[in-house]
């Protein structure tokens, strides 16, 4: 029924629109409006479902795009927060590493100084011992030299002051002293 009414209106509209003999401007305007309404009606009738389907699909696509954009924004926010947190953790770890490195370096420096002092003390002690040994050796050599010189001097004195008769008397006295 709708089709018949629309077809009739179309034919009527076209026939009246084609008639221009005695038409005034208001009638022309009226029939142009009728033709436009008929055209829009036909477009709606034959293409309404497709247009509606297209617009609904487009609306759904736009809504999906908005949802995806919101999800991507949330994901980006989470990633940004994670990156900030990791940056803070990295800064903290860096500060801790620097602190530990400084403490370790200080301990190593103190340990090295302590070892150097111990080595210096050992070297001093060894030097003192070496000096004492050398002093004792020198004293022993001096004593030996002094004894040898004293013996030489004694021999020369005895040889010069003792003659054979004095020597015999001295031997006899020594033997008597040993017998007693």
Curated annotation (Swiss-Prot):
Membrane topology: Single-pass membrane protein
Covalent S-S links between cysteines: none
Signal sequence, start to end: none
Lyase is among the record's keywords: no
Domain of life: Bacteria
GO molecular function: proton-transporting ATP synthase activity, rotational mechanism
Record text on subunit structure and interactions: F-type ATPases have 2 components, F(1) - the catalytic core - and F(0) - the membrane proton channel. F(1) has five subunits: alpha(3), beta(3), gamma(1), delta(1), epsilon(1). F(0) has three main subunits: a(1), b(2) and c(10-14). The alpha and beta chains form an alternating ring which encloses part of the gamma chain. F(1) is attached to F(0) by a central stalk formed by the gamma and epsilon chains, while a peripheral stalk is formed by the delta and b chains.
Function: F(1)F(0) ATP synthase produces ATP from ADP in the presence of a proton or sodium gradient. F-type ATPases consist of two structural domains, F(1) containing the extramembraneous catalytic core and F(0) containing the membrane proton channel, linked together by a central stalk and a peripheral stalk. During catalysis, ATP synthesis in the catalytic domain of F(1) is coupled via a rotary mechanism of the central stalk subunits to proton translocation. Component of the F(0) channel, it forms part of the peripheral stalk, linking F(1) to F(0).
Name by which UniProt lists this protein: ATP synthase subunit b
Organism name: Sulfurihydrogenibium sp. (strain YO3AOP1)
Upper taxonomic lineage: Bacteria, Pseudomonadati, Aquificota, Aquificia, Aquificales
């Amino acid at each position: 029924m709708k089709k018949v009414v629309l077809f009739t209106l179309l034919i009527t509209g076209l026939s009246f629109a084609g008639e221009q003999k005695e038409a005034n401007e208001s009638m022309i305007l009226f029939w142009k409006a009728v033709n436009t309404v008929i055209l829009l009606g036909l477009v709606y009738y034959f293409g309404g479902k497709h247009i509606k389907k297209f617009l609904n699909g487009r609306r759904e696509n736009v809504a999906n795009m908005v949802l995806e954009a919101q999800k991507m924004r949330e994901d980006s926010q989470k990633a940004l927060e994670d990156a900030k947190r990791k940056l803070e953790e990295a800064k903290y770890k860096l500060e801790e590493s620097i602190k530990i490195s400084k403490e370790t370096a200080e301990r190593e420096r103190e340990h090295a100084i302590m070892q150097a002092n111990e080595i210096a003390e050992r070297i001093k002690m060894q030097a003192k011992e070496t000096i004492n040994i050398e002093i004792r050796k020198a004293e022993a050599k001096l004593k030996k030299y002094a004894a040898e010189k004293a013996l030489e001097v004694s021999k020369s004195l005895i040889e010069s002051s003792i003659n054979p008769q004095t020597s015999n008397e001295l031997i006899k006295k020594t033997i008597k002293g040993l017998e007693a």
